[in-house]
Amino acid sequence: MVLSQAYRMCIEAEGAGARPAWEDLAARDESIALSKTPQWIDCVCSASRFSDATLLFRGDDGRRLILPRLRKTGTPSFLGQFESPPQGWGLGADAGGVLTEGGPASPSQITALIEHIQRHPGLRTRIMVGEDDAEAWASVAPNALYCTSRTAQVLDLRGGFSTVWSKRFTSKVRSNARKAERRGVVVESDNTGRLVSVFDALYRDSVDRWAQQRGQPLSLMRWRAQRREPQSKFATVAQRMGTRCTVSIAWRQGEPVAGIVVLTRGPRATYWRGAMDKERARGTGANELLHRCAIEAACAEGRHSYDFGIYQTEELKRFKSTFGTHEVPVHVYYFERLPTAAAEAKCHHAAKQVVRAALRVARPGR
């Protein structure tokens, strides 16, 4: 089946059938983003209700193209809901897109891919496109295609840690990292999964704090967090990623005060998750020290960038910017049989506003 006049390509395999070619392409090039590897898709499948529906294409020039894709378990292809990747499994600026043999995908190849997805979207196909492919996708995506935009923050590590420390970190970061050491904060890092339970306890504390900050009912916030981010998810990533996943905990006086999870592949290090006990961490500089240690390790390993991920709040944006980050666009494209994504987003926003208003009425003294 011809999918594009400008660049012709055909589907060769889907799911397990695409795996040998996919593993071959990923093994050839360590610079390929982690989100485009079979190992990351296996993490998603092991820890959530998705199955591998990755597509392998062959272009008329002989090049192979891979679209990492997952299908909600229990749905046939023609009625399926496809994600690339599912919500909660993005990796910041390393957000996915297409893996192309011989270098980055060209606009004509992406056009061919878009044409195919438009013809066969299932009920919905959602594709998140980050740093590697964002510009090419934006140049050819049809105006009628629904798209949302996010922003990731990335720190350039070129020049080594001494350059990053002296020229990119702000004086505030340097001061707080030193203060943490003076106040007895010690960072412990592990890539065996041993610290996952410690991190998870900090994460549950953070969920309670986020509920208060966002004006959400505590029980609802806890339920959503347990559903989307259970401890088993962190454990699965740590186990499957092995040395590519480092859990770091900042300790003070024998108590954990903050933690981060960092993933690595090739030139990239990605800050994937973070959590803290805000009362214990307050005024200690623990978070700055955690990231300083992770960034120093990434520099020592020869990484080129440290991805702080997509910011969720203005407070987090300001914190990450103090490390000297630059902003990277991340686009999310929705291919739908029935155009409902935009309406769902509006309803979701309206529902959050109603909940917040109800909480203000219930607690008038606050």
PLM features: residue spans?
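Aromatic (often tryptophan-rich) hydrophobic motifs at membrane interfaces
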Residues: 56, 79, 84, 88, ...
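Acyl/amide activation-and-transfer machinery of modular secondary-metabolite enzymes
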Residues: 88-98, 147-154
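Short catalytic-loop micro-motif centered on adjacent basic/acidic residues
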Residues: 125-127, 188-189, 304-308
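Active-site/acyl-donor-binding loops of N-acyltransferases
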Residues: 2-8, 71-73, 139-163, 300-366
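A conserved beta-strand-loop-helix scaffold within acyl/acetyltransferase catalytic domains
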Residues: 5-61, 67-81, 132-149, 160-282
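Non-catalytic accessory segments adjacent to catalytic cores
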Residues: 104-152
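A short, internal acetyl-CoA/4′-phosphopantetheine-binding micro-motif in the GNAT/acyltransferase core
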Residues: 93-105, 274-284
